[in-house]
Amino acid sequence: MVAERYTVDLNKPLVFQVGHLGEEYQEWIHQPIVCVEGPRFFESDFWEFLTRTVWWAIPTIWLPVVCYVLSISASKGLTFPQIGLIVAFGVLTWTLLEYTLHRFLFHIQTKSYWANTAHYLLHGCHHKHPQDGLRLVFPPTATAILLVPLWKLLHLLATPATAPAILGGILFGYVMYDITHYYLHHGQPKEPTFKHLKKYHLNHHFRIQDKGYGITSSLWDKVFGTLPGIKAAAKKS
């Protein structure tokens, strides 16, 4: 007897439904629903609230933190040129983190109930509803939690003076990433660089999901061989 395929009811909260899709989950999330109005995730208004973040909350919350940690490095004797170089290193580090997380965590293949559920919350929802403007940037609460182990790791690997500046660079890179990501989905860029980035990223969403993992840059896609080719894109379209 063939098991009946599970059907997600889009009129009900989605999070605890998607796990039932099993092996069909990956196919389902890559059939996007393009609308500005996002779906409901939870029955609870409290948990629903925590999943929604306006884009401008990211620079408002995190840029002051960037300035604060850079001031720590300055107070410990680093010059502004030294801080600038370390921040540049931190930003470069972020671009590699951006690529690595997107490729190996956000696009991990899942099929069990809880793995599908967790993946949907992490990234699957963005591929299913790519224009949901309130679930495009990373929630500040989750970012704050992740910053704790990162801060401790940097203190182990770097000096007391350089660790804050590295964190500032990584955090600044993250802010630029989230703002850029939002703009690529909801902006209408005229400048050639951003027009290219928008086309590059939407190609990842709608044509070749296993290529083009960079958001702010295609650098690491070039380095690691995941740059989508023109011929491949044509075949998928």
Swiss-Prot record:
Q: What is its EC number?
A: 1.14.18.7
Q: Which GO terms describe its biological process?
A: fatty acid biosynthetic process
Asked if Zinc is a keyword of the record, the answer is yes
Q: What happens when the gene is disrupted?
A: No visible phenotype under normal growth conditions.
- Membrane topology summary: Multi-pass membrane protein
Question: An example Gene Ontology cellular component term from the record?
Answer: endoplasmic reticulum
Positions binding Zn(2+) 1 in this chain are: H102, H107, H123, H127, H204
Enzyme class, broadest EC rank: oxidoreductase
The note on the cofactor says: Binds 2 Zn(2+) ions per subunit that likely form a catalytic dimetal center.
Q: What induces it?
A: Not induced by H(2)O(2) treatment.
Needed cofactors, names only, are: Zn(2+)
Q: Which InterPro entries does this UniProt record tie to the protein?
A: Fatty_acid_hydroxylase (IPR006694), Scs7 (IPR014430)
Arranged from A to Z, the UniProt key words for this protein are: Endoplasmic reticulum, Fatty acid biosynthesis, Fatty acid metabolism, Lipid biosynthesis, Lipid metabolism, Membrane, Metal-binding, Oxidoreductase, Transmembrane, Transmembrane helix, Zinc
Please list every transmembrane segment annotated in the UniProt record, as residue ranges. 54-74, 77-97, 134-154, 156-176
Which residues does the record give as Zn(2+) 2 binding sites?
Answer: H126, H181, H185, H201, H205
Q: In which tissues is it expressed?
A: Expressed in leaves, roots, flowers and seeds.
Q: Which reaction does it catalyse?
A: an N-(1,2-saturated acyl)sphinganine + 2 Fe(II)-[cytochrome b5] + O2 + 2 H(+) = an N-[(2'R)-hydroxyacyl]sphinganine + 2 Fe(III)-[cytochrome b5] + H2O
By what name is this protein known? Answer: Dihydroceramide fatty acyl 2-hydroxylase FAH2
